[in-house]
Amino acid sequence: MLNNPALLERVDGHALFANAAAMKAAGITAATKDPSGGRLERAADGSPTGVFVDNAMALMERVVPAPTKQQLRSQIIGAIKEANRWGLTGVHDAGVPRAIIDIYEEIARDGAYDLRNYVMVANSDSAINYYLGRGPQNDLYDGRLWIRSIKIVADGALGSRGAALLEPYADDAKNNGLVTVPAGRVHDVAVRALKAGFQVNVHAIGDRANRTVLNEFEQALKEVPVPDHRFRIEHAQIIHPDDLPRFAELGVIPSMQASHQTSDMYWAVNRIGPTRVLGAYAWRTLLNSGVIPNGSDFPVEQVNPLISFHSAVSRQDANNWPAGGWYAEQRMTREEALKSMTLWPAYAAFMEKESGSLEPGKFADFVILDQDIMQIPAELILKTNVVATYLGGKQVYQRPVQ
């Protein structure tokens, strides 16, 4: 293995680990500079250790052999079936390149796309130009694909200390994180999107990234005042108290993933300190914005949506720790948690007239569980199984007889 080029990607997609053979293949040396928005971890002598964070990952990704179209198609169909197995009828798919969207459309034309996918176009000029020129695409292929959104990544992740913070990390005093997009990019794309009827969704985890995105959204909305824009900040994990009310004021939707809180809570206070953590994973406070779509962020977290449901209502891990919940005052009620995974994501995707609830005129998308998650004790939620999944009235998953 030591002689073969090898790359491992961190689960959150914000760091790569390369061995010496891989770095040699990519031409990485001590003289290789950190790119804007990226970082190479280095030894004391300045030589790269093999850890590439955020935009530095591209230095290694350029030498990775590309999968074939058939491999991608097979993986996509497999992922759809896996999503159905866990009770998913729809997803919001962030940062998708045009080549992958083309495969989605091909599978949908073949009648094999058993999922409703709200696609966020990747942040590349060529893809943005193409899809803005094409215009918003709603309800394609019997409601399988919706293409009317653009995804931008504004900073890194908390786990790899790449989330952009206003003040240094509590456990890394010389590091404020990484800004992964040029200044003004969010504003410029937002202006174009508003004029074309598109939504903009921006990944922002740190308080500096969240503030910057809110500022650039605010300026764009002054220039192109569209009332029902439904711009989103994806994750919105760490927010300065001064910025919490700005979501509601600007009509920006905080799109969060409850399972991040229960994954991060073991080290979050050490990472950002006891004061900043009060503005982290602050769902109850952000509910003043009206809606909080709640997803899983798979494959960063597990695909099972009940993990996020359980996290939202308990703020505990699968072992019911900590007792009473982590900063339990920020919990959601079960009704709020259910809406955060049904009605509110539909609204956040301009799909509330077609999806999000079982009503006349809407898609007959639903899941049958073997327990009532609205009534059982919280500690039993994660022991719930999916019995069957239906999309448009068609059964797309049936649990095998045990």
Feature names for model-found ranges:
Residues 1-133, 148, 152-209, 222-225, ...:
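Divalent metal-binding segments
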Residues 138-141:
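Accessory "access/gating" subregions that flank catalytic or transport cores
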Residues 158-160, 245, 378-380, 400-402:
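Short conserved micro-motifs at the rims of enzyme active sites and ligand-binding pockets
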Residues 190-201, 205-231, 235-236, 241-245, ...:
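His/Asp/Glu-enriched, well-ordered alpha-helical/loop segment
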